[in-house]
């Protein structure tokens, strides 16, 4: 039996979410085993393909796919469970991000990512009916291809800034997302605007995607000293370690500031201020 036949049967018989099923199909094709016979699949074959991929998150996901699909056959179960990679983004300033969002046709969806921490599929599924006061019930998400409206990656009620809740409350019918409309439209709009000459001049060539806005949201709360448990709830993470490990944005200058300084270097900048104080005295 070919992997395509076996995998289709397995995936459709398990209670996977729509987006998870689509990801499994895509991953099996990326691994290059879609048309192979199941009896020829083994861990060494999967490793040879995955180890050529540079992105840690992609390697991790492909190993998960192989272990999941073939677990009933006992194949690929010795593939490693890689550590999640914490991303470090060089995110533009808040003013620059808001400038970009205001230029987008999908302004409301991007605002929900930046000031509500929503994933792009969740932002597309927002309607006024999901509001209770300024609390938003995140209970649905569109799949990336736009063909399915189902459950989000994580459920939860989050508190929106009042002005943003008002924007959601006043949504017009033409702002509602519809089945068949891919959420990539939001991502492409965001990326295209960040590649414009004006934005390049403003930021020095930084690019932006909707998930970076979600990172900004978490990072901004943590930098303002918001309790990590509150951040976790607003981000709808299953545990606070995910909040701190993966979604805390650390700028390059903060890393540099954390490095120890030699005593000889510390004395130099102190000489001038000390003399100045003595003169005043």
Where are these regions (language model features)?
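Basic, Lys/Arg- and aromatic-enriched nucleic-acid-binding interface segment
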Residues: 56, 78-120, 124
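Active-site/catalytic core of tyrosine-dependent DNA strand-transfer enzymes
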Residues: 160-205, 217
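Short, aromatic/basic-rich helix-turn unit that serves as a nucleic-acid recognition element
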Residues: 1-27, 51-58
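C-terminal secondary-structure termini that scaffold catalytic or DNA-interacting sites
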Residues: 151-157, 162-164, 170, 260-281
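Phosphate-coordinating loops and pocket residues in cytosolic domains that bind phosphorylated ligands
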Residues: 43, 102, 125, 133, ...
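N-terminal DNA-binding recognition helix of tyrosine site-specific recombinases/integrases
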Residues: 27-81, 117-121
């Amino acid at each position: 039996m070919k992997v395509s036949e076996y995998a289709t049967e397995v995936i459709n018989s398990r209670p996977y979410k729509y987006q998870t099923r689509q990801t499994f199909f895509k991953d099996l094709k990326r691994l290059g085993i879609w048309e192979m016979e199941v009896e020829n699949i083994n861990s060494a074959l999967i490793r040879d393909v995955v180890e050529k991929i540079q992105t840690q998150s992609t390697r991790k996901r492909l190993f998960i796919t192989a272990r999941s699909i073939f677990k009933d056959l006992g194949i690929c179960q010795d593939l490693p469970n890689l550590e999640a990679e914490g991303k470090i983004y060089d995110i533009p300033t808040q003013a620059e991000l808001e400038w970009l969002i205001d230029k987008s046709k999908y302004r409301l969806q991007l605002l929900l990512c930046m000031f509500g921490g929503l994933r792009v599929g969740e932002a597309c599924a927002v309607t006024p009916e999901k509001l209770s006061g300024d609390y938003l019930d995140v209970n649905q998400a569109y799949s990336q291809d736009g063909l399915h409206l189902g459950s989000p990656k994580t459920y939860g009620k989050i508190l929106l800034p009042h002005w943003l809740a008002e924007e959601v409350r006043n949504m017009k019918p033409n702002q509602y997302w519809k089945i068949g409309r891919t959420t990539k439209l939001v991502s492409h709009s965001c990326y295209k605007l960040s590649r414009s000459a004006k934005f390049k001049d403003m930021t020095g060539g930084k690019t932006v995607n909707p998930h970076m806005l979600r990172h900004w949201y978490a990072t901004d709360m943590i930098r303002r000293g918001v309790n990590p448990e509150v951040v976790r709830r607003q981000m709808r993470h299953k545990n606070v370690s995910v909040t701190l490990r993966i979604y805390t944005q650390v700028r390059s200058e903060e890393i540099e500031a954390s490095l120890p300084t030699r005593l000889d270097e510390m004395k130099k900048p102190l000489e001038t201020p000390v003399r100045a104080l003595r003169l005043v005295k």
